Amino acid sequence: MDGIVVVDKPADFTSFDVCAKLRGIFETKRIGHAGTLDPMATGVLPVFIGKATKACDILPNGKKAYTASFKLGIKTDTEDIWGEVLKRQESFVSQNEFVAAAKGFLGDIKQIPPMYSAIKINGQKLYSLARKGIEVERPEREAHIYQLDILNFDEKNQSGDIYVICSKGTYIRTLISDIASKLNTIGTMTALRRDASGGFSLSEAFKIDELQRLKEKGELQNALISTDKAFECFESITLDEKRTWLYKNGVMLRADQIGAKDDTYRVYGFNSEFLGLLQTDVKENKTKRIKNFY
């Protein structure tokens, strides 16, 4: 089997755990995922099966959507409720104050990654250093917040929920901590659910036990999404029979042979088979293969 299955990752599972489960269900070792989710987080985890694993590192849609819960007046070493509590303090923030502060983070922002993250500094993952009690300086990283909605805010308990659409690499727990800092208080994330990632959403996601039941009924193929759906943001080109043969035999086509402008394209054979991604250079009359999927 080849394709993409969108998994609704359960809490207490690492992304690797999910892949391990699916290797058993799909009976293949060729499985990978895109967009790691923290163990306590739930939601959309795109998993790639068979030939589709070639797409893991080239997904074009970097936007992600999250629903997160938070509580003000508490600070942990991980910036989420599952870490060690470092500080507690009284917090007196109104809903209007929180909304105003949060809206100030729309657009381009900079974040200092948390120590408990998979980012590498001098070849070492930050969380490995953090577990040894070592804290190192982390350079700021750019991120973009496309949408930030306050779903609710409980002034009495100083807690609430937000919905965020953001760029790849955005840390929601850091965003919550930074909003709290802007309000001269502290805050931590108490829950996280990914609603969308890489163009895939919860509406097309399967729980692991649902996939197991589909396998038992011989309907596992119904859970798979074709690999080319991940690249629908690109225009498509369909080759005739001769050029399909040339393409599949490694011949580099000229840009004028396929009538393309400067862009990245999904390439299909004459029989509608998804062949891969192609980049064109009209000025040089060249094409460059990004990835083959046949």
What are these regions (language model features)?
Residues 87-90, 125, 169-173, 241-255:
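A short, terminal or domain-edge coil/loop segment
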